[in-house]
Amino acid sequence: MPICTTRDGVEIFYKDWGQGRPVVFIHGWPLNGDAWQDQLKAVVDAGYRGIAHDRRGHGHSTPVWDGYDFDTFADDLNDLLTDLDLRDVTLVAHSMGGGELARYVGRHGTGRLRSAVLLSAIPPVMIKSDKNPDGVPDEVFDALKNGVLTERSQFWKDTAEGFFSANRPGNKVTQGNKDAFWYMAMAQTIEGGVRCVDAFGYTDFTEDLKKFDIPTLVVHGDDDQVVPIDATGRKSAQIIPNAELKVYEGSSHGIAMVPGDKEKFNRDLLEFLNK
């Protein structure tokens, strides 16, 4: 099983398929690298090398108690890129993974990178405030933590509805999508589930985004019920120099998994990679 051991002894599991220029996928909360199966196949079939790791406390990586903050996540990512000696990398990050990508650039720069893709990602900041009126209210994050702590198995089933906008007429989500979400969520540690909410809910990545000096594609659904586009994707595209924004009309937070949306995203991703 492919493992990268971090500077503090955590074992990070990753998939490493294909050959060619590397594309590294960073998953969201509460998922793992399996969320990127369709994208991994798409890039490998197109001649790229696809890599997707499980964040600490997620999937097959070490179920640690500590280290659920973005400085640590960014350093874990740096350990992976360094261990595999990856260069000319495109980082593709979903949701919470977008914070990991942004903080990686903020802490480690873009020397190993070619480009970046932010998909339904949390930067610049999620929490609602006077400066961020379109953000998410504090009580939402409290409810997320409470759900993880009290009855997480049912909570993840309920959460999948909004994640995929299954509560909208004409939605394209399948029962398989929901089942896959639940399976991955249950592989996350309970402590990681709670602490990640504090991390992605309240961390401000504005200064990290200002350090981007590589081509960046921002993709976001305008019906994202988890990470509102007006507070995140649109603002990130304004902050990152020369970023390209693609808005998917009517699409949910689960673009990379839902039939129809995932094929569209794969086409846009490959077009961006081929530039």
From Swiss-Prot:
Its EC number is 1.11.1.-. The active site is at residues 95, 224, 253. This is Non-heme chloroperoxidase CPO-A1. The gene is bpoA1. Keywords: Antibiotic biosynthesis, Oxidoreductase, Peroxidase. May be a chlorinating enzyme involved in 7-chlorotetracycline biosynthesis. Able to brominate as well. It holds the Pfam family Abhydrolase_1. Belongs to the AB hydrolase superfamily. Bacterial non-heme haloperoxidase / perhydrolase family.
